[in-house]
Regions:
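Generic C-terminal helix-cap and adjacent flexible tail
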Residues: 61, 120-128
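Structural recognition of alpha->loop->beta junctions
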Residues: 21-31, 103-123
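Substrate-recognition "cap/lid" segment bordering the active-site pocket of phosphatases
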Residues: 3, 10-72, 78-86, 101
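N-terminal processing/targeting junctions
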Residues: 6, 31, 125-128
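Acidic, Mg2+-coordinating phosphoryl-transfer loop and its flanking beta/alpha structural elements
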Residues: 73-113
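Short secondary-structure boundary segments
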Residues: 7, 33, 95-97, 116
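Structural detector of well-ordered beta-strand residues that form the stable sheet scaffold
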Residues: 3-5, 92
Length: 128
């Protein structure tokens, strides 16, 4: 895991990640603007843009497309899955988060993990 692309306002995302001691695990942390969260613009209309921004920053040259073949979006809502699709990324839904398995499948997640262990197996071993 190298990047976070969250619909939460970026300052809050950074605080949450820091609180749990994961700051050093990520090269890039992107979130929405404070006003976007208040209008729900980020979760509905900007998720794809936030993902694209994170990929551009992660690439080091602003070229998000250069990472497309080496990137997977892991998310717990339909917005995450739809944002991945908008960026031509494969996606894994995590049903132990905010959204349900049904929501993730209906949004088009290629795979859904019910537990952290399931996610680990999917990512490291290619298991379903």
């Amino acid at each position: 895991v190298r990047a976070v692309a969250s619909s939460k306002p970026e300052p809050f995302v950074r605080k949450i990640i820091d609180r749990f001691g994961f700051t050093d695990a990520f090269d890039v942390i992107c979130g929405s603007g404070i006003g976007d969260e208040l209008t729900k613009k980020a979760s509905r209309g900007q998720k794809a843009e936030i993902i694209h921004k994170a990929m551009g920053q992660l690439s080091g040259n602003g070229n998000a497309e250069s990472l497309a073949g080496r990137t997977v979006m892991i998310g717990d809502t339909n917005y995450d899955i739809l944002g991945a699709k908008a960026n031509s990324l494969p996606s894994v839904g995590v049903a132990y988060g905010y959204g349900s398995r049904q929501e993730l499948e209906e949004a088009g997640a290629e795979k859904v993990a019910d537990t952290v262990e399931d996610l680990r197996k999917l990512l490291l071993c290619g298991e379903r």
